[in-house]
């Protein structure tokens, strides 16, 4: 078991103290394990306070080894780290890629001892990410793909990476990023690509909160 690092997320449907506890217990049964390494709260909406209290208790019981959050923007992250919180989030998983680099967000997380974790490090290929001239040219210097350049860039920034693939060859490629190092010039060139705009959606928009609320209630009605 110790050779695997297992992460799971709590969806909004299971927020609130009792529901969150029940959700983790169900995950433990399904995974057939005594503990989960990291449990994340998926969104900063609904009763995430109650859910977080449940995770703190499960942490103290040894059933989870670390608590994390996802998509928590700076003010909500600060709220989760202050006010006598028993356990500070270990990570905050946010969209992070060359076009949305989250530099200020990372600085804010470091202030509270929270590690940044990137979801959508490749932006799901949006905006021609894999054929971006800057990334492709840097890759040619090291005989690496644009995807490998992105992963290496994140590693050198101290960003934890959550990337996935269903293709074995791409999984293998994703591991081959420890045999080269980007120069300062390379890092600056990638830094210049930042637009600070999401390739997906803005969690601070009221319309986005309304969308999540509608989705949760539609799921309950099924």
Regions found by a protein language model. Give the residues of each.
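A short, structured active-site edge motif that brings together acidic residues
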Residues: 2-14, 37-44, 71, 95
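Local beta-strand N-terminus motif with an aromatic residue
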Residues: 3, 33-36, 64, 89
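Hydrophobic alpha-helical elements and their junctions with loops/disorder across both membrane
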Residues: 14-15, 34, 99, 146
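CE4/NodB-like, metal-dependent polysaccharide N-deacetylase domain
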Residues: 20-40, 57-61, 83
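Short, acidic/polar
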Residues: 16-31, 50, 77, 101
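Beta/alpha (TIM)-barrel catalytic core signal, keyed to glycine-rich beta->alpha loops juxtaposed to Asp/Glu
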Residues: 43-222
